[in-house]
Amino acid sequence: MANENIQIKSSLDDLKNFVQNPKSQNQKIKAVNQLMYNEFVKIETAINNINNYIENLTHRLELTNENFKTKVQEVESKAQQKINDRIEELDKRKKEEIENAKKYAIEKSIDSAINIVDQLEIALEFASLDPAVKNYVSGFKMVLNSFVNWLASVNIHRMDIKPGDKFDEKYMSASDKASDPDYPADHVCKVMKSGYKLYDRVVRHAMVAVSDGVGYVEPASSEQEQPQTPAKSTQTPPAQETASAPAKTKPTAPPTNNLNANKPPVVSNPPHQKPVQPPQSNTPGPKQPITHQVIKKS
């Protein structure tokens, strides 16, 4: 734009100088007409350039506006999606919390019901040892089973933990450590109190005694128990060498009876001699019968 203004000013200056020069009127008119035509052409060209520039700017502005609108819509869509996801997550979490609250509403009152089961189990354990109340054991068992079934109906289940199971702190609580040769280390050797679950949540850990492994011997594997048969030799010794080889004999000791090895030696009387009588004391005592020993002649 600045260059075009300079050109217009220069053209006007030329026109002014042309008018001031003394020339013929026709030549002046022709020159003025030509100059004006040229100026009009330049002005038209400049106007066209300006219009093209304005159109280009307008088009670029429209594209920029469209891109801006598109980006704004994308940002709004993403933001709205995040808001919807967050709302859905909160609704889902709220529903889960409400469901869990309904599901585990009786968790606080479970202890009293489990204590009743513990007391019935203790009563059965001692009733089986007392013959006076042994006849009532079957009735106690019926009451206990019906109560356990009622607990199962409200989704309170007894965990199946027995001696020999591997200790697991998720479901068990070790109250004692004992030496039991029947169980390896870190294994349950006794269950003092049963554990219970409400649905999949542990409401009471099982109270167990854990073996320390002292005195436990691992059972031999089946491969070790089978006796190994010696491999047969493919080479056979020559018959002549085995026949001609002198047999080496070892001195044999007289057989002894292992049962009499720890007994003191019995001293027998020599043949053809009377047995030696013990010395008699001077103090009088009860008369003992006289026994005669018959000695057989060999």
Curated annotation (Swiss-Prot):
Record field: transmembrane: none
Regions of compositional bias (Low complexity) in chain numbering: 245-265
PANTHER family: GRPE PROTEIN, GRPE PROTEIN HOMOLOG, MITOCHONDRIAL
Organism: Mycoplasmoides gallisepticum (strain R(low / passage 15 / clone 2))
Name assigned to this protein: Protein GrpE
Cystine crosslinks: none
Pfam family, one: GrpE
Single GO term (MF): protein homodimerization activity
Stretches for region Disordered: 218-298
Cell location: Cytoplasm
Recorded family membership: Belongs to the GrpE family.
One GO BP: protein folding
Biased composition (Polar residues): 221-243
Quaternary data: Homodimer.
Any one Gene Ontology cellular component term annotated for this protein: cytoplasm
Protein function: Participates actively in the response to hyperosmotic and heat shock by preventing the aggregation of stress-denatured proteins, in association with DnaK and GrpE. It is the nucleotide exchange factor for DnaK and may function as a thermosensor. Unfolded proteins bind initially to DnaJ; upon interaction with the DnaJ-bound protein, DnaK hydrolyzes its bound ATP, resulting in the formation of a stable complex. GrpE releases ADP from DnaK; ATP binding to DnaK triggers the release of the substrate protein, thus completing the reaction cycle.
Gene: grpE
Principal cellular location given in the protein's record: cytoplasm
Keywords assigned: Chaperone, Cytoplasm, Stress response
InterPro entries: GrpE, GrpE_coiled_coil, GrpE_head
